[in-house]
Amino acid sequence: MRCVTSFVVFCILMFFVLNIFTVEVKAQRLVPLCKTIGYENPGKCPADGNKFCRRKLDDRYVKYKRCDCQDTKGRKQNHHRCICYMKLPCNQ
């Protein structure tokens, strides 16, 4: 019983000690989004893949500097994925 009481008292003291020393943490600035990755679509990239991706992901609020079309293979079928960059260089 003596050990249990000592343990409870120790835990309460540690709780108070840890709450006395508060540390202020500055909020980190959010890194602006640089890259947008589209969904996987069936079929291969067309001949004008970059322009195709730009048309597909283009938005009136966001202007992309560059878009790439990448061919991928999944479940024995061809797919393509569009990746567009809002600013260059995109260091993430």
Curated annotation (Swiss-Prot):
Any one GO cellular component localisation term in the record: extracellular region
Location relative to the cell: Secreted
Leader peptide range in chain numbering: 1-27
UniProt main location, coarse: secreted
The organism's place on the tree of life at top rank: Eukaryota
Disulfide-bond pairs as recorded: 34-90, 45-69, 53-82, 67-84
Keywords: Antimicrobial, Disulfide bond, Fungicide, Plant defense, Secreted, Signal
Protein's GO biological process: defense response to fungus; killing of cells of another organism; signal transduction
Family: Belongs to the DEFL family.
Protein's UniProt name: Putative defensin-like protein 251
Organism of derivation: Arabidopsis thaliana
Primary gene name: SCRL12
